Amino acid sequence: MKHNFLKSLTIPALAAIFFATGCTKKIDDAFANPNAQTKQPVEQLLPGIISNMAIQHSANGTLYGPQNDGLYFGRYVQFWATNGTGNQYDQMGDNFINRSDVLGSIWAMHYYGMGANISRIIEWGTEEKKWDYVGVAQAVRAWGWMTLTDVHDDVILREAFRPEQLVFKYDPQPDVYEEVKRLCHAALANLSKTGDGVNPANLAISDRYGNGGDINKWKRFTYGVLARTFNRVTNKSIYQPDSVIFYANLAMQNNSENTTITWSNTGGTGTYSFWSPFRGNIGALRQSKFIADLMSGLNGQFPTGNVDPRAPYIIRENPNGTYKGIRPNKGSDLLTSVNDRPDNFWGDAFSITAAPGSDNAARYIFKNAPIFPIMTAAEIQFLKAEAMLRKGDKAGALTAYKKGIELNFQELRTNYEVSVPAARRMTDAQRDAYLNNSLVVPAAADLTLSHIMMQKYISMYGWGVTEVWVDMRRYHYTDLDPTTGQQVYRDFAPPTGIDLYTNNLGKWIYRVRPRYNSEYLYNVDELNRLGAFAPDYITKECWFSKP
């Protein structure tokens, strides 16, 4: 949590001066408190809240949001790896030994970047009967709670957003998920209201870089949050596939209803994506062998022997024109020929880590101001397919599965094709051949969890890093598909032995620690209660993935 320790120091000091001098004028009248709450138009608060759903840059050091943490989570799920060896994140580690705030960006996003501003929109928007703003704020807070607990497990819930407190009690994950559901239903009720201060044109201005003020899209997003939340507990007896399916059917059904973020691209640092050449934050990252093999028809789940038509849209070819990648903590050990090493995500050679002067050669979500998905119709179809398969409805699962792939193809062609060289753009014939390949889209009786989860992984490559990490932890990285006896994530090889972070004590990562520079400095008793000072705390499994 953000702690107002300066306030606790300055107020007693000012009071002492007041009484010592015998001044009779009230301090509040004499010295306007620059930190005092003043009412601001809710229209001015919403843009910053929405930007936090990707990355927030409000001042030096305030790089809060999923894009920042995603640089590291992406190593855990092997979207990418560092182009060298010895990186603790490639080894499924953290940076606690250096008292670092790395992996604390979602924590800061929720409690600081969004925090009080969402509370004020809900309070002031209610006073002004701007139910559309209230509903959006509640929907984003629900998403924030879900995202926060997904990566940290126990978090501060009941005592959150209390500026008078310096220390806070933590609450268990089931309570947080219940709050997510409560907020979603409250959001839907407010988003359904009309009249009073509701003004779609007014909302569209504040929501310019998000859903554009489209209430239907915000409702679809909120239903998607509910579908995600109900699908978290697939390993438990309380799992309800019908609830996942119900909310998935109310969430986005086509790509025009996707929730996405974009940037103004106008010159200031905060007007560009955190993963862009302008920001220069991903110069050392290279696509993994896992994704490259998956997109090259070399993965055991989809052994087509042919390149997936989506490959040039989401990953990079090498000088030989093929798709290869690197293994965690191994650098380019298997790619002895320079011509086998993939270009970086900005289109320069493997060896180059400096950002280029423009994003002309960048593609997909790695451009300066890309369309950056937060939730898509394709993801929702894969959620639905998994729930239907678990329920035993294989025909329904196959329909949703195929639709998810089709939606992903459409999304890539609509939003990202302009950056793909003409010679590498997919044709309708290539798309149809892929979808008609029984190795990819089998008969209903042959559909497996591996089919669904691996295609979901492809459809969320890059942007969906936090959600994919949830999925991989639900399947404990290497759980077996009950139908095939093979790993659900076929050929996925988490680091082991010397490639696994020493402090993990031989175990894989399942959570990240609370943000260091608030919790480990001020909330020591609570963290001791949770065991969060243990070197291997990050290997402690979250509640959602346990039986």
Name each model feature, range by range.
Residues 18, 58-59, 414, 461:
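Intrinsically disordered or highly flexible coil/loop and linker segments, enriched in small
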Residues 1-32:
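Bacterial Sec-dependent N-terminal signal peptides
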Residues 23-81, 109, 360, 476-547:
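Membrane-proximal, proline-rich intrinsically disordered regions
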Residues 75, 198-217, 268-273, 423-428, ...:
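Amphipathic alpha-helical surface "interface" segments used
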Residues 402-486:
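Active-site/pore-lining binding-face segments in mid-to-C-terminal subdomains
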Residues 40-43, 82-416, 442-450, 455:
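Structured, solvent-exposed acidic/aromatic patches
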